[in-house]
């Protein structure tokens, strides 16, 4: 029997209906909601006269060609010599060849903005525009830089002028978005809503962001405030990772004095940013009314007994997986857990040997004893049957039986995903000074189907699942080798190895795992990510019609405008659900400052400078400059945490800072795809499988340089 509780992720629950009706399911209904908000607010906007067709939505006119001189210089940016790259470009700003000088000034404008040199950025982009006044991308960039500098009227005029240079969707849509933001930041919410309405009805790639902005505008205007939740629901239905939409929704339900929902949404935010004192205070304040039942309002799976019961084991390489790890991959100190076995089980102490046996489906409890710093093994009546300060093992006597770990208690209900989990193999209990940790020692082949289960929402085709199984098997083998001397090889919250229990597996996953065992990757860093555009970390893929993309700071911004090609392998089935491929978020600078302050107080944010890139421009390092200091990191995951509390989809993005005076007030992030862009793209694999490619062909496509071993014959390709 399963007990489902409220999700601790960005999905709005049915109880929100008391605040607003469920978000509309089609663009037609969505548009009527926009019109209603516009009318309620006396806004003068009209729906776009014509709907965009598929050809227009997937056509790209963007040209990534660079003059040879500039192409050579920007390679210094990739190598991490961002300052040398900047000053080398300056040698070409007055080059007699207009093609070279305009390109140099364009790159310098973008790099200057990243360095917080706003007035210089304006000067450079105006110089680029004067050198090449017919280039629509230069004109568009000019509008965005003026907007960043707070020159709202000039920005709107520039965006309007762009429409005389081009009618191409990629440029026009970005210009309309810039115009809407210029109206909003200048305080004219009616005009902003009207401009956002145009984008809302014409650009399916921006629905989530525009819905959020319409919700934000509605929340700030009394006549339409009651409609704000509808737009926020729509925003989250199109992109569940839109952190600002959740933050705004939390404030709205708080104003409505709905303590339960306020706790739920603040708990969602706090689970992502657990060092945030303001969020901690909100969670504590509204949690008081829920008492000990607060955990029941989180999305934790509860199982009364094992679901699988029996599953034949496949002897293979053993993997030690630490359970209940947090986002930093640290296994949490547990205080109490219950468990049962689907067959007779035994407890073995590392020194005493076998100390206890217990029958199937009998609940037992492991509880930390703060006096002894050990753990007590108790029966259903609370009587201690065994105590230990040393690690001990729990294992079903028959290898095809399973163990269920349930009702987990940790120091904080937000410390990790505390869902119940059914396991294969052995459960190792490790007492510590402050609790105990759990490690699952399991065969790799028994683990792989459960790892596949966490990805079935992304991929459903058998060939794609088989390809992912190959990647997982190879990655597990690498992890075992690399961490052979450690107490565990992986955690259950690793980005590559999300584990929610064997209770989620089904026949197709077992078959995919078995079939895929015929080959294995060697000498490659096997990995995967959920969804993809055409520019991966160091390759151009996922389409038959590959763009001539080359890296430069300007080309990254240009690519963020680009339409996905019609034949994109990762193309979603629902034409309104593009957020996993293209996304836009707007973050308050004060939130970014507060997360940096966990490590170092740099004061108010002055500049956000990418410092290291992958060959194609994914951000691998970033410098944050403030009024009191500078903080720098070369960890993409930390970058995404600082900017978005870890809710951003990938490290492939550009940034438009919006200044108020000399410091940044808001940060607009425009991004593509998910993850780090390395290895197997799950949605891309699904697309290739639909074209008839088998799992071997998919593996060869995404790992063209890998050595593939045939596990049956031992031959290597």
PLM region spans:
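Bacterial N-terminal signal peptides
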Residues: 7-15
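Conserved, single-site charged/polar hotspot
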Residues: 20-90, 98-100, 107, 112-114, ...
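Positively charged n-region of N-terminal signal peptides that target proteins for export
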Residues: 1-4
């Amino acid at each position: 029997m399963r007990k489902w509780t409220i999700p601790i992720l960005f999905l709005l629950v049915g109880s929100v209906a008391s605040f607003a009706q469920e978000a509309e399911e089609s663009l037609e209904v969505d548009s009527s909601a926009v019109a209603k908000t516009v009318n309620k607010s006396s806004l003068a906007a009209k729906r776009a006269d014509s709907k965009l067709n598929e050809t227009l939505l997937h056509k790209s006119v963007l040209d990534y060609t660079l003059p040879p001189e500039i192409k050579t210089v920007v390679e210094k940016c990739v190598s991490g010599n961002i300052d040398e790259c900047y000053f080398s470009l300056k040698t070409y700003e007055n080059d007699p060849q207009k093609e070279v000088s305009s390109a140099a000034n364009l790159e310098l404008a973008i790099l200057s903005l990243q360095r917080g040199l706003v007035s210089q950025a304006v000067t450079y982009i105006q110089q680029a525009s004067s050198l090449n006044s017919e280039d629509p991308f230069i004109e568009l960039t000019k509008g965005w830089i003026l907007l960043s500098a707070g020159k709202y009227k000039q920005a709107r005029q520039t965006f309007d002028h762009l429409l005389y240079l081009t009618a191409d969707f990629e440029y026009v849509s970005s210009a309309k978005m810039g115009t809407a933001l210029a109206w909003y930041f200048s305080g004219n919410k009616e005009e902003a809503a009207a401009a956002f309405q145009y984008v809302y009805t014409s650009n399916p790639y921006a629905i989530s962001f525009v819905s959020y902005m319409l919700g934000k505008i509605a929340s700030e205007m009394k006549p339409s405030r009651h409609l704000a939740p509808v737009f926020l629901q729509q925003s989250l239905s199109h992109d569940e990772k839109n952190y600002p939409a959740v933050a705004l929704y939390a404030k709205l339900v708080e104003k409505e004095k709905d303590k339960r929902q306020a706790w739920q949404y603040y708990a969602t935010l706090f689970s992502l940013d657990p060092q945030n004192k303001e969020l901690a205070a909100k969670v504590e304040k509204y949690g008081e009314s829920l008492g000990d039942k607060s955990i029941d309002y989180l999305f934790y799976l509860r199982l009364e007994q094992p679901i699988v019961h029996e599953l034949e084991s496949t002897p293979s390489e053993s993997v030690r997986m630490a359970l209940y790890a947090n986002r930093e991959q640290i296994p949490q100190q547990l205080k109490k857990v219950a468990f049962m076995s689907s067959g007779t089980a035994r407890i073995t102490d590392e020194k005493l040997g076998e100390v206890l046996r217990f029958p199937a489906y009998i609940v037992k409890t492991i509880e930390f004893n703060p006096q002894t710093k050990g753990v007590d093994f108790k029966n259903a009546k609370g009587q201690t049957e065994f105590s230990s300060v040393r690690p001990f093992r729990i294992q079903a006597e028959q290898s095809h039986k399973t163990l269920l770990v349930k009702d987990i208690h940790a120091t904080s209900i937000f410390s990790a995903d505390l869902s119940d989990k059914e396991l294969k193999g052995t459960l190792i209990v490790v007492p510590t000074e402050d609790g105990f940790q759990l490690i699952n020692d399991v065969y790799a082949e028994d683990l792989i189907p459960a790892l596949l289960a966490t990805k079935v929402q992304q991929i459903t085709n058998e060939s794609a699942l088989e390809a992912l199984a190959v990647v997982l098997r190879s990655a597990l083998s690498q992890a075992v080798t690399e961490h052979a001397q450690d107490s565990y090889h992986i955690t259950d919250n690793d980005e590559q190895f999300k584990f929610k229990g064997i209770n989620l597996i089904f026949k197709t996953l077992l078959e995919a795992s078995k079939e895929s065992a015929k080959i294995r990757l060697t000498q490659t860093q096997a990995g995967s990510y959920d969804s993809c555009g055409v520019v991966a970390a160091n390759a151009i893929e996922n389409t038959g019609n590959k763009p001539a993309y080359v890296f430069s700071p300007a080309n990254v911004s240009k690519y963020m405008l680009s339409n996905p090609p019609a034949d994109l392998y990762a193309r979603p089935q629902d034409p309104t659900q593009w957020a996993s491929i293209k996304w836009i978020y707007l973050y308050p600078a004060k939130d970014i400052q507060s997360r940096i302050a966990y490590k170092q107080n740099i004061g108010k944010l002055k500049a956000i400078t990418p410092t290291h890139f992958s060959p194609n421009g994914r951000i691998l390092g970033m410098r944050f400059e403030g009024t009191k200091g500078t903080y720098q990191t070369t960890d993409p995951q930390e970058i995404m945490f600082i900017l978005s509390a870890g809710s951003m989809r990938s490290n492939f993005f550009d940034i438009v800072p919006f200044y108020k005076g000399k410091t940044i007030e808001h940060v607009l992030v425009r991004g593509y795809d998910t993850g780090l862009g390395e290895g197997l793209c799950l949605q891309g694999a699904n697309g290739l499988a639909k074209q008839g490619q088998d799992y071997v062909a998919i593996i060869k496509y995404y790992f063209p340089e890998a050595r593939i071993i045939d596990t049956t014959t031992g031959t290597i390709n």
